[in-house]
């Protein structure tokens, strides 16, 4: 049985790329044509890449490898948290802090601080502090939960990283390259496939497209650890917007 079908990719808008003037020529092998000034991604190539990525991820998950999902754009943030949690992986979905991987010792210190503050809240120790001090500590806790909540149980560097929008998450890509951590990445037509290990060409700006691809990768991890994956819950699209142009230039 195919991992992904052309019909579900069409329905999710996986084939829509960026405006032709904003393309990266290295994505040419994955582009089918251009229509009305917009590149159309070759979904046959995408299906092949999804199949390859699924097998690669599942094989590594079966070997006990741990995955970190990264996607900080609005369209991806909720999906990243939901799918990474579903398959028991780590995630970063707010802001990539410099040195998140290359300076892991320091980041781990902040993660330990997050756990300490959470314990204080759970035991009631936080409420016993003077009002002003407690307020400061709660703000610190909220900030740490926002940026590090998805990796608070990560004891060491991940074995592989799944990235949505290689161009936007450039800093994460660079850190993975420095450390030799394999990258699985969803790439729009403005991205560079040469800087990742397992490319998946597809629309990384449309919510349904991101959901479809990320859920397949999460399925691979879940199935490797638990057997057949449950049907992924329908993502709540209210309040989230598809954006085809704005976010890609922020990296």
UniProtKB/Swiss-Prot annotation:
Coiled coil: none annotated. CDD domains: RPS2 (cd01425). It comes from Synechococcus sp. (strain ATCC 27144 / PCC 6301 / SAUG 1402/1) (Anacystis nidulans). SUPFAM superfamilies: Ribosomal protein S2. GO terms for molecular function: structural constituent of ribosome. It comes from the Bacteria. Keywords: Ribonucleoprotein, Ribosomal protein. Pfam families: Ribosomal_S2. InterPro entries: Ribosomal_uS2, Ribosomal_uS2_bac/mit/plastid, Ribosomal_uS2_CS, Ribosomal_uS2_flav_dom_sf. The keyword Ribosomal protein applies. GO terms for cellular component: cytosolic small ribosomal subunit. One of its GO terms (biological process) is translation. This is Small ribosomal subunit protein uS2. Belongs to the universal ribosomal protein uS2 family. The keyword Ribosomal protein applies.
């Amino acid at each position: 049985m195919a991992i992904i079908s052309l019909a579900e990719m069409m329905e999710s808008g996986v084939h829509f790329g960026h405006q032709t003037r904003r393309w990266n020529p290295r994505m040419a092998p994955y582009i089918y044509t251009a229509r009305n000034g917009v590149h159309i991604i070759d979904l046959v190539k995408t299906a092949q890449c999804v199949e390859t990525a699924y097998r690669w991820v599942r094989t590594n998950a079966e070997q006990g490898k741990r995955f970190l999902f990264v996607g900080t754009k609005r369209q991806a943030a909720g999906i990243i948290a939901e799918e990474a949690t579903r398959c028991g992986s780590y995630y970063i979905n707010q802001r990539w802090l410099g040195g998140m991987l290359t300076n892991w010792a320091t980041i781990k210190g902040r993660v330990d601080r997050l756990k300490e503050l959470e314990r204080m809240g759970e035991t009631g120790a936080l409420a016993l502090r003077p009002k002003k001090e407690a307020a400061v500590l709660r703000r610190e806790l909220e900030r740490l939960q926002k940026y590090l909540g998805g990796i608070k149980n990560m004891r060491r560097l991940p074995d592989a990283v799944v990235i949505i929008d290689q161009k936007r998450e450039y800093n994460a890509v660079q850190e993975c390259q420095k450390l030799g951590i394999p990258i699985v990445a969803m790439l729009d037509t403005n991205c560079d496939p040469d800087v990742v290990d397992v490319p998946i060409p597809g629309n990384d700006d449309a919510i349904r497209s991101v959901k479809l691809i990320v859920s397949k990768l999460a399925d691979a991890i879940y199935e490797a650890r638990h057997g057949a994956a449950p049907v992924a819950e329908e993502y709540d699209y209210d309040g989230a917007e598809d954006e085809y142009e704005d976010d890609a230039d922020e990296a």
